[in-house]
């Protein structure tokens, strides 16, 4: 079943997480080391859909730890409080003028995706925020 807008859902075996960010678009978050991710995903989901591999266009950064929310709140304009941005929530936002997808995958863990050309800039923004918070 597809998740509601800005939520995620996991496959039965937890190997694939689906993110719903737009009405007609779902992103699949999973680990796969082959060269045919589209075929792999199609066989795993067994659902009639179009699949496009976009893994080479994204830089992914995980921010985790007891103060991870404090670090991200300095650069993220959305409400990351645990009551609002619960585990499993996903959203598109702008962080430090950079388009970003943020996914909360644990109590103190967030996954950030940004266009790969902005990866170093995003990492720098996170490091500066961490230096100011920690």
Could you say what each language-model-derived stretch is?
Residues 1-134:
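Basic, glycine/lysine-rich polyanion-binding surfaces/domains
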């Amino acid at each position: 079943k597809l998740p509601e807008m800005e939520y995620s859902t996991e496959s039965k075996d937890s190997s694939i997480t689906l993110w719903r960010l737009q009405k007609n678009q779902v992103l699949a978050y999973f680990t796969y080391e082959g060269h045919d991710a589209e075929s792999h995903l199609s066989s795993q989901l067994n659902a009639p859909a179009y699949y496009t591999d976009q893994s080479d266009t994204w830089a992914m950064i995980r921010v985790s730890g007891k103060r991870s929310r404090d670090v991200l709140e300095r650069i993220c304009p959305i409400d990351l409080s645990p009551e609002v941005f619960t585990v499993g929530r996903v959203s598109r936002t702008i962080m430090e003028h950079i388009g970003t997808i943020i996914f909360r995958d644990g109590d103190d863990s967030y996954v950030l995706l940004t266009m790969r050309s902005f990866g170093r800039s995003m990492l720098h923004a996170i490091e500066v925020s961490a230096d100011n918070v920690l």
